[in-house]
Amino acid sequence: MQAAWYSQNGSARDVLHVGEQATPTPAAGEVRVKLHTSGVNPSDVKSRTARPVSDAFIIPHSDGAGVIDAVGEGVPASRIGERVWIWNGQWQRPWGTACEYIALPQQQAVALPAQVDDDAAACLGIPALTALQAVHLAGDVKGQTVLVTGASSAVGHYIAQLLTQQGAQVIGTVGSEAKAAHARSAGCQHVIFYKTESVADRIRAITQGRGVDVIIDMDFSGTSPLLGTGALKSHGTVVCYGSNNPGEVPVPFRALLYGSITLKFFLVYDLSPQDRAWCLDKLSSLLQANALQHTIAAKFKLKDIVQAHEAVEQGRLIGNVVIDLTP
């Protein structure tokens, strides 16, 4: 099969290769999916750059969509021909979705409603599931004010939609006018231009000094200083799913303690079985109801995977980047 892979960390141009790899055979409990699309997420390019390579090679990307064409022992043959989307394709294993075929445990290939196309389906495993878990951890947000950092990102756009559906007032941070328009299209009633405005001052103005009830955060290294400014109410909650600084991050401990602030962190690859089941069930319902907007910023063929990774790294596109694996 045709696949893209890397054997060492480095820039996309230096380490990504495209060529032939062995076509996998599904083991017991597995399905093989003929992939139509592969989603490229920021975590994929970060892994290529910095996560130690302990296998002979890594076929990148965890998200994708396609059709089951073979099943292993113990999997009903009736699943052959089923359209599916994939989660955790390359989590703790070297075989991701940047290839023509993937074999993986059958529960990681989820039935896809007919009305959801393959491009949108390549955006579900990380962006949509991260958004669902973040909003789930935020609790009952009806009538509350929620700050979403990175509201125009793939994850942030889904988060803003979900919060709006649940009756929250959503404030989003963005980096440009185009990204502000995208955030508003997801339901953000207010946007803050974090590059040119004081986020804390704008929050206090919007909330008349009360602060927000919840912060759903993509970059704890950037948001941690905000927690000592009164931007978050006492007894407020922070739900965080990432940090641009993966090392130690200082926190305003006194403000957190005396504000009785709740911090909730999670890694979408490592949800508890109960949370994973809840998110998958909720996402299936939303997809059936056509209740989510999906934004595809750019599509590339597998031979152009270097440009796809570079596009994600540059951060200028609005929406998801997808690899088209069809002939």
Where are these regions (language model features)?
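Glycine-rich beta-strand-centered segment in the early N-terminal region that forms part
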Residues: 22-39, 49-90
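C-terminal capping/lid region of NAD(P)-dependent oxidoreductase domains
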Residues: 1, 289-295, 306-327
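Mid-domain Rossmann-like dinucleotide-binding core that forms the NAD(H)/NADP(H) cofactor-binding site
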Residues: 122-196
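Short amphipathic alpha-helix with an adjacent loop that forms part of the alpha/beta core around
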Residues: 199-209
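N-terminal Rossmann-like NAD(P) cofactor-binding module of classical short-chain dehydrogenase/reductase
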Residues: 85, 213-216
